[in-house]
UniProtKB/Swiss-Prot annotation:
This is Small ribosomal subunit protein bS6. The gene is rpsF. SUPFAM superfamilies: Ribosomal protein S6. Keywords: Ribonucleoprotein, Ribosomal protein, RNA-binding, rRNA-binding. Residues 97-143 are annotated as: Disordered. It comes from Xanthomonas oryzae pv. oryzae (strain KACC10331 / KXO85). The lineage of its organism: Bacteria, Pseudomonadati, Pseudomonadota, Gammaproteobacteria, Lysobacterales. The keyword Ribonucleoprotein applies.
Length: 143
């Protein structure tokens, strides 16, 4: 019987370039066992709340999956035997979570704010240029 789980695992920051391959390996393990991945989010490198193995940052990955117990056990075992995985947490859920997590939403908002501020800065620069090149003084009278 399949159940829903939320899985978060932390990868050593020196192994960040290996994360896509690790995700593919875990995806194939889940899908090979007739499981379903409802949500997969790569949160990237983030600050740890406390040092783990003298590290202050780690690469975070979130999975919301629907698998049976045998596949989940195999997944957890693969986390345990992978030295690059610093920590993992598996939480049983009542149903599938498919909407974007709060961390990804806040990342998107930060990206939007950055884009807006960048656009505003460019608009300000463009607004300054025509005023400086206007020589007939029409803008001075209109203002």
């Amino acid at each position: 019987m399949s159940r829903h789980y939320e899985v978060v695992f932390l990868v050593h920051p020196d192994q960040s370039e290996q994360v896509p391959a690790m995700i593919e390996r875990y995806k194939s393990l889940i899908e090979g066992g007739n499981g379903t991945i409802h949500r997969l989010e790569d949160w990237g490198r983030r600050q740890l709340a406390y040092p783990i193995q003298n590290l202050v940052k780690a690469h975070y990955v979130l999975l919301n999956i629907e698998v049976d117990q045998a596949v989940l056990s195999e997944l957890v075992e693969s986390f345990r035997f992978n030295d690059a995985v610093l920590r993992h947490l598996v939480v049983k859920r009542d149903g599938p979570d498919t909407e974007q997590s709060l961390i990804m939403k806040s990342k998107d908002e930060k990206g939007d704010k950055h884009e807006r501020s960048e656009r505003r800065r460019r608009d300000d620069e463009e607004g300054d240029v025509p005023a400086a090149t206007d020589t007939d003084g029409d803008n001075a009278e209109a203002a």
